[in-house]
Regions:
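N-terminal pre-domain segments of enzymes
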Residues: 22-56
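Surface beta-strand/loop "capping" patches
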Residues: 210-240, 316-321
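Short hydrophobic beta-strand segments in globular cytosolic domains
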Residues: 143-144, 256, 329
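Active-site mouth of glycoside hydrolases
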Residues: 137, 147-160, 178-189, 193-196, ...
Length: 390
């Protein structure tokens, strides 16, 4: 047989082995979205709607993993297989579905490459959530640690990167679950009654973004419905004190207001023909923000806001009432645990998460009582877009 044909067949066989290596584990009930999940398409959308940048790398997908006792050192770790990030090791969609004990340590490892356009820029490594305590290494150097299973965190890994070639990330995780007094929701090692399967390790998106030395770390909008304005508070990393900012306010994709001025800690912008947000009319305004210095662009981000006001007022009988835009509002919604049979705390996909919310809206609910869980940041953007109070 032609050697080229043999080589093609061999490569094809290798490709099939790699493609079919991952699959959901276990025979427990799964959602219809489970069969659509692949290592190539898992949670690929930009993970932070409130502050979006163009240059980023999604690190979800297959990572090497190992489970050891907590006394095992990094140099003695032998990886035993692959795990699909961002699903917890106990979940079916991780491809592992193993019980993880408080005496265990979970190790992750993967490689990535940087685009040449990232040269002379800083690289920020983001974790949406890791349950519960973790250490992170880049190219065999400890970058930092984090404790807490629900909140996002990040590290500037620029100084740990090699000038070229593949870069390596390793993560080590421990999780006491219910053996310590920590924020764990309904996780319990012995599932019974109202208690659920534990969630250990990476369970939200891991990603990298490129920024300049001076960049927008955070933009926080707060609105005033009486003044029909939005105030933007900025947190700027590496600010020199002479930066300028250009802000465009967009309504349905059309620029309705442009402001250019020297950057200050907080800026108030009037919104022309302002429309208030409500569950019946969930109006969102979008922002294009450009940070510059002497004509040189330092950063470009997108964000959004809604004109609304939530407070508590006395009614005619003297009872406290929650009000939206100065009017009492009856909140009608379910207690939502946010657990999935196949992904546990992690929805199998963004489509699955959105479908759930759309159905609640169709049922006539105007709010969701999210129960002992912090969702991925996309969840709250969809709530704003659909008209669901949280």
């Amino acid at each position: 047989m032609d050697k080229r044909i043999l080589l093609t067949l061999a490569l094809g066989a290798m490709s099939q082995v790699f493609t079919h290596a991952w699959e959901p584990k276990g025979d427990k009930i799964k959602t219809v979205w489970a069969e659509q999940v692949t290592p190539e398409n898992v949670w690929q959308s930009y993970p932070r709607p409130q502050l979006q940048r163009a240059e980023w790398i999604n690190l979800n997908g297959l990572w090497k993993y190992a489970v050891t006792d907590q006394n095992t050192s990094r140099k003695n770790v032998s990886f035993e297989g692959e795990i699909l990030v961002p699903f917890a090791i106990e979940s079916s969609l991780s491809g592992v579905q193993k019980t993880f004990l408080p005496t265990d340590k979970l190790w992750y490892q993967r490689e990535f490459s940087l685009d040449p356009s990232w040269k002379n820029k800083s690289a920020i490594l983001h974790f949406g959530a890791v349950d519960y305590e973790c250490q992170v290494w880049v190219n065999n150097r400890l970058v930092g640690t984090h404790k807490g299973g629900n909140n996002p965190f990040s590290f500037d890994i620029t100084k740990y990167l090699k000038k070229s070639g593949p870069q390596s990330i390793e993560v080590a995780v421990t999780d006491p679950t219910d053996t310590e007094s920590i924020s764990r929701g309904k996780q319990q090692l012995n599932q019974e009654g109202i208690w659920y399967t534990p969630v250990s390790g990476i369970w939200q998106t891991v990603w990298l973004e490129a920024v300049n030395k001076t960049y927008i770390r955070q933009v926080l909008p707060s609105t005033d419905i009486e003044r029909k304005s939005v105030k933007l508070a900025f947190d700027i990393a590496g600010a020199k004190g002479n930066e300028e900012v250009k802000i465009e306010v967009l309504d349905d994709g059309k620029v309705i207001k442009t402001v250019e001025q020297k950057l200050t800690n907080a800026m108030e912008i009037d919104v022309p023909n302002a429309v208030l947000w409500s569950p019946e009319s969930p109006k969102l305004y979008h922002l294009n923000i450009v940070l510059s210095n002497g004509g040189r662009v330092l950063d470009r981000v997108k964000s959004y806001f809604a004109l609304r006001k939530v407070d508590v007022r006395k009614d005619e009988c003297g009872y406290n009432r929650i009000c939206l835009n100065n009017q009492p509002i009856f909140q009608y919604g379910p207690l939502d645990q946010g657990w999935w049979p196949d992904g546990l705390l992690t929805p199998p996909s963004e489509e699955a998460m959105l479908w759930d919310m759309v159905q609640l809206k169709k049922m006539g609910f105007n709010m969701i009582r999210k129960h002992i869980k912090v969702e991925p940041e996309q969840y709250y953007y969809y709530a704003d877009s659909l008209g669901l109070m949280m």
